[in-house]
Structures are given as structure tokens and as C-alpha cells.
Amino acid sequence: MENPQKAGPLLRDLTRAFSHYNKHNLLLKKNLKETIAFFREIRQNHSNTCSTSGPELDSGQLRCISFPRHDEDHLQKVVGCAPYILILGQDCSARYQLLNCMLGERLLPLGSDAGGACGVEGGACRRRKLCFTHGRQTRLSLALPGQYELVHQLAAHCGRWDTVPREDLEIQECEDPAQRLAELEITLHHALLQEAKIMVLPCRNVQPVEEALEDCRRGILPIILYAVSKATLSADQLSELQKVRETLPYPVCFVRIPTEPAPDPPGQRSALFAQLVSQELIGGAAGNCACGAPAQTPGKMQGILGEDLERLHRVLVPFARQVLQSQQVEATTLLNAVHCRCLDLFINQAFDMQRDLQITPRRLEYTREKEGELYSSLMAIANRKQEEMKEMIVETLESMKEQLLEDAANLEFTDIIMTSNSEPMSSKDIKVCISQIQDLIVIRLNQAVANKLTSSVDYLRESFVGTLERCLCSLEKSTGEPCAHNVTSNHLKQILNAAYHVEVTFHSGSSVTRLFWEQIKQIIHRISWVNPPSVTSEWKRKVAQDAIESLSAAKLAKSICSQFRTRLNSSHEAFASSLRQLEEGHTGRLERTEDLWLRVRKDHAPRLARLSLESRSLRDILLHGKPKLGRELGRGQYGVVYLCDNWAGRHPCALKSVVPPDDKHWNDLALEFHYTRSLPKHERLVNLHGSVIDHSYGGGSSIAVLLIMERLHRDLYTGLKAGLVLKERLQIALDVVEGIRFLHGQGLLHRDIKLKNVLLDKQNRAKITDLGFCKPEAMMSGSIVGTPIHMAPELFTGKYDNSVDVYAFGILFWYLCTGSVKLPEAFERCSSKDQLWTNVKKGSRPERLASFDEECWQLMEACWNGDPSQRPLLGIVQPSLQSIMDRLCNDSDQKSGNLEDSN
């Protein structure tokens, strides 16, 4: 090698870059393997659930949670790629010199030792492809690409060597075709080769470049180097480079190999640089900067030119790192997107399942109550309406009498052959005529009475039946069993229509209605005829008159009400029976839903969240590197906080290191990280910049999660000790309420609002931090978490909602009003945490100080009310606080008039 002493930084840094790639690739491969196993398990569990519980869950919550096949295949290809350094060049001498420079030793012959020139000057060059791999012992062999080793006597086998013999590099004229295609495998015990393989392409006279690169299209991640020994590239070489770009869509690092005369004066752009820029083979902005090009997105990566071989490491190492990282960043971004998408689906489905578990029993109970109210109301109408109905029938008959007589006189009989002069007919025909006249009267009377009866219960149909049908429709949809409960629901709706839509019963042509009409007709007194009369209009009128007078309004009313009650009772019983069947179906479904909900909360979501944390942390360390820990800022129950001067272009930062002791804590931390990372940025919350998993924490004895977040000036505890004026304290209270309201609006509970979890900037504006206990309500398991003084009584029962944050704010507001960090007397007297909890559950609260403003005291009392339902909503607390602040702080002379500091 020309300058072996200069190869140190290049070898060291390049080996480190490939080592980091391989280490990160192992982590990525492990995460991908566990992700595939997770989704396979979800799919199997889902299939087993469907097979044991019928079709209920077949179209249920977990069908959309899957690993898209094309994403999985793409990621499998990425993690399966081995890093390669591909060396191309204008001629074999330039390639060999670049290889020697990279390995730091003169392994390949140069100059006269290498034989004749290749390319345009020496067309007889027959140097074959070289492949460098790692091994414990140095050896050379010929092998067909991707196949088997050839038994061939090489010159290197005949004795000791330091430089590969020229005869072994060249294809001999007498070799058979198989040996002419074989590549020379050189095995070395070398640090760089432990991390990556190196391939030197053959002379173009031996094999065209596109054929030589064909084996590199799959399963490798190439770092492409092109050695340039001339001032510019020829047209054939540019064409060759175009084929390289078509075969392998990766950027190329061009390396100028020094020749005897200096090609260009120092500090000037070379002709080669201008040519490469014009051909869009390198980026014009990057130039030949010794520091390397800035980070670029994978799709926008460009080649680079290194014009100084002695300073090659300053160009090649950043270039190699960029190529290696870009693919891994893309892969981790894709994998994390799959994790986050499915995790969000899990959380949303947990909300849906929790709501289903809460609302379905209420809907069933509501349906039962409403039907009972409807039944009672209609039965009351049937019982009290009989006398009214009798009067209504009499009034109806009186009002309709003349019209009925007129219609009867003009009635045209059916199925009776009438004579032209209305002569007397047989007794049989006369009976038919009388029956038709009676039918006319009964039908008209039925219509009139039915319309009036319907109007009397119309408001009940609108109030009850519509609501019942909507409830039934909702219950039907939530069963997920169209073959079973859908029929029951439809039957229930048919019963409702038949029983309660009164006009349908009266107006339909059903057998029930015909029976009803027959019963009414039996009330009419039979008319006997001695001699068959002449069927004239007067006769028809007389028959109708007698029929109307023979009707008994009392019996008719009694019959109608009796029918109404009978149908009502039977419908009520059928409804109750069908509702019980529907409830039984829902009971089994809800049991399975609750089991699935528990699995989502306890197993599925936490496991996926851990995979998401790992993929996101891997992406962050690829993009921004591992953060440097500064001085310790503080310690908490679950971690240590350090200063971090700069990370990801943000400074200063705070770094919280958490060492989860077991899988449960890992999963909890991962879920909490997901909730926090998913939150939109808000000025009242401390920003979380990213995370890194440190596998070497504590000298490699444990694994720590490093959470990098926004650095603020101090916490509220320190601020109160230092002294804050009233206006600042009230503004802090407003800021905290605004932050809690935002969290609640995102469906999250903080569960640990306290002085040390409120940070202040240099203007003493507050931000909420430490979302360690932050969770959506649907994902809570009822665990007892928080700081004892700020914990609401219901937290000890495990059943609570977001009002626990209102309680905690009430305690925090007490401290803000006192202006000190001194414990309330009721809490200071407690000798242990258990005694404190007992007193809080019994109703012990902070005392009122003489300096407190009345409105402030009322607000904090309302916030820490023992009954969660009696605590004010934060939407009410915020304007109340603003009103207090306006009243107490508008006039600077009154800032301390109504509320004095007690410290």
C-alpha cells in the first residue's frame, strides 16, 4: 500500500460504521421477528375465538389488526441484506489501489507487479472478480458465484505470500469456461471483513459490468466505490456508470486515485467534479467537502467525490454511514408505523368494548322499562275508555246516521241478480242483501271509531314505540349474530306494530279483524221477515235504520275494549319473552367482549407497545445518535433525570433514564410512551423529543430507556420555595388547568398532578410533565397510582374517572394559595402513608388559612369534594380561576390585599 500509516482512521471509522449497522440490523431483525410472531398469535387467537363462539367475532374488533403482507415482505428483505463494499473503477490498477487503501495493507499488486495495463491502453487484461471475506486463516480459492468451490491449483498454494500472486488474479488462456467465470475468494482475518464483505469487479474485458452486478441485485446492501485515475471519465465509462445505476439504485462514491502529476491546483474545482455534477452522478452542493455531505432522505441520496486519498475517511465514512442508515431508518419508520397504527386500533377498540359493556345492559333495561310504561299507559286507556267509547259510538252513530242511510239506499248488492222492477226475491237472497247492508254499517262505524281511538293513543306511539324501535335496532346491530337475534328483533318490532299501532289492527284484512267484525255483527238484532219484500231504496233504508237502532253502544264499547286488552296482554307477554331471549344472547356476547377487552388491556396492547417503543427508539438512535448524559438534575421513584446539552438539534434537553425491572414495567412504560408520543404538541405540556434504548447502561448489566424531553427552568416545588407573587401563582393554576383539560380532551388521565410534576419556564409559565401514570380511561386496570397527598379517595377502590385529576388540582391549588410548600396540618400529623390514606378516605382535607380569599377556598373545596360527581368540570374551574385572577390582580395595589403569602 502507498500510505499504510494513513489508513488508521479510515479502517477504524469504517469498521465502526458497519459494526453499528450490523448491531442495529440484529435489533431490527429481532423486533420484526417478534412482530410477526405477535400478529400470528393474534390471528390464531382470533380464529380460535371465532370457532368456539360462532360467527360473533368473525367480523369483530381484531380483523383489521394485521401486518400488511407487502410491508412484511419488504422488511424481511431489508433485514436480510448483508453489507457489501463494491469497488469499480476506470482500470484494474485504480481498483486495486483503492482496495489496498481500505484494508490498510498492500494485498493486491500495483504498478509493474500487477502486469499489463487494462482498458484502452491494454486490451489484453484478464483480471477476474475478487471477493474478500472474513476467516480465521488466510486462504485463496476459486469458486463459481453462489455455487461451489473449484478444485484448482493456485500459485498462492505453492508458498508463503504477502501480496496475492498476479497469476491467481488473471484468467489463463487454457482454463475451461467454468474456471473463466469463477471468482477468486480471498479469506482474511481482518476487522473490516468481520463486518462487511468486499467485492472488486472484474476487468470489463472479462465480464460486462451489468453481468458482474447481477448477483448483487438481491440480498446485499452495497456501498459502491468508483476509483478514478484519469482527469475525466470517457463516454464508455459514463455509459457503464449508467448501467450500474440501473442495476443498483444506490449513490456512488467516486475516489480520485493520485497520479504522478497533480491534476488540479489545490482549492479549485476539478474537471472531474464538473463532469460528475453535469451528469448528475454527484450533488453539486456537497462538492468535495472533506466533512461529507449532510444527511439526506433515502430517495434523495446523491453521490459524492473524494479527491484526496489521504483524507478519504472524511468523505467515505459519512457516505457509507448515510447509505447504511438510510435503509434502516426507512425500515424502522415503516415498522413503527405498523406498530402505532395497530396500537391505536387496539386502544380505540378498548374504548368501544368498554362502552359496549356499559351501555348494552342500560339499553336492555331502558327497553324493558319503556315497554312496561307503554303497556301500563295503554292498559289504563283501555280500562277507563269504555264509558267514553260508548258515548263516542253514540255520537258517531248520530253524526253518521243520515249518511249511512243514504249510502245504504244507494248500495249496489254483489252476487245478487236483481230484477228490473225490484220484485220480491227468495228469502235466501233477502238474507244476503240484509247482510251486505249490515256489513256496510259495521265497516263505516269501525273506521270512524278506530280513527278516534287511534288518535287517543297517538301520542303514546310517538313517545314510546319510536324509542323502543331505535333501542331494538341498536341492540340488534350490537349482537353480531344476524341469523339469531336479527329474527328476534324483527319479531319484536312486528309485535309492536301489531299490538300498538291500533289503526293497523282495525284496517287490515287479517283473520283477527274478520273475527272481530263478526263479533260486532252478532250484537245486531236479527230481523225476521214473514214475506219476502221488494228490494227498493226505501226497503234498504228501512233495513239500515233497523240495524242502526238495533246496535248496542254499550256492548260494542265493551267488545272493543275487551279486544284491545286481550291483544295488549298477549303482545306484552310475547315482547317480554322475546326480550329475555335477546338479553340472554347479549349476556353471552358481553362475557366474551369483556374477556377480549381484558386481553387487549393486559396483553395485546402492552406487548405491541413494547415493540413500538423498540422500533421508535431504534429509529431515533439511527437518526440522532445516542444522547450524552450530563449532570444529574433529580431522582424520582422510577428514574433519574440528567441534563443533556444537545440532541436531535434541540438544546438544552432533559434526559430521564428508566430501568424497568420486569416485563410488566416494560409494557407499562411502553404504553405510556405511546400515549405521550401520540399527543399533539401543546404549550402547557412538556414536549417529548424522542427515546433511545441503551443496552450498555450500567456497564451492560441492565437495559435503560432514555426519554429525551424539553428542559425547563425549575419545578413548582422549587419555585414556591424561592417565592412567587400572587399573579404568577394564579397564572400557574390557570396553566395547569389548561394542560389537564387538554389531556382529558385527548381521552387521557394524568393521575399524578403534584408540585414536582409542574415545571416552570423562565417566565414562570407552567407545563405539566411526567405523564408516567397517564392512561386512557378504557385502558385503566384500576391500579392504585399517584402521590398520597394528592390522591382522591376513590383511587383506593380502583374505580375512578378523570375527576381524580380535579381532586389533585384542588390540593395543588391549596399550595398555590398558601404560597409555600409546607404540608397541610391534617396531613403533617399522619405518621405513615396508610394513616394518611385512612384519613383522606374519612374526609380529612387541608385546612383553611386566614389569608385565603373566600372564592379561592370555595373553589378548592369543590375540587376535593369526596363525591366525584359533585366536583366541578374543568371547563367551569378555568373561567372561575380567570375571574379570581382578574379580581385580585388587576390593580397592582391589591395584589397582596386579599391573599397574603403565608411563607
UniProtKB/Swiss-Prot annotation:
Residues 627-881 form the Protein kinase domain. GO terms for biological process: cellular response to fibroblast growth factor stimulus; embryonic organ development; negative regulation of apoptotic process; positive regulation of ERK1 and ERK2 cascade; positive regulation of fibroblast growth factor receptor signaling pathway. The keyword Transferase applies. Its EC number is 2.7.12.1. InterPro entries: Dual_SerThr-Tyr_Kinase, Kinase-like_dom_sf, Prot_kinase_dom, Protein_kinase_ATP_BS, Ser/Thr_kinase_AS. GO terms for molecular function: ATP binding; protein serine kinase activity; protein serine/threonine kinase activity; protein serine/threonine/tyrosine kinase activity; protein tyrosine kinase activity. CDD domains: PKc_Dusty. Gene3D superfamilies: Transferase(Phosphotransferase) domain 1 (1.10.510.10). GO terms for cellular component: anchoring junction; apical plasma membrane; basolateral plasma membrane; cytoplasm. It is found in: Cytoplasm; Cell membrane; Apical cell membrane; Basolateral cell membrane. Its main location: cytoplasm. Keywords: ATP-binding, Cell junction, Cell membrane, Coiled coil, Cytoplasm, Developmental protein, Kinase, Membrane, Nucleotide-binding, Serine/threonine-protein kinase, Transferase, Tyrosine-protein kinase. It catalyses: L-seryl-[protein] + ATP = O-phospho-L-seryl-[protein] + ADP + H(+); L-threonyl-[protein] + ATP = O-phospho-L-threonyl-[protein] + ADP + H(+); L-tyrosyl-[protein] + ATP = O-phospho-L-tyrosyl-[protein] + ADP + H(+). Residues 382-414 form a coiled coil. SUPFAM superfamilies: Protein kinase-like (PK-like) (SSF56112). Belongs to the protein kinase superfamily. Ser/Thr protein kinase family. May act as a positive regulator of ERK phosphorylation downstream of fibroblast growth factor-receptor activation. May induce both caspase-dependent apoptosis and caspase-independent cell death. May play a role in the embryonic development. This is Dual serine/threonine and tyrosine protein kinase. The lineage of its organism: Eukaryota, Metazoa, Chordata, Craniata, Vertebrata.
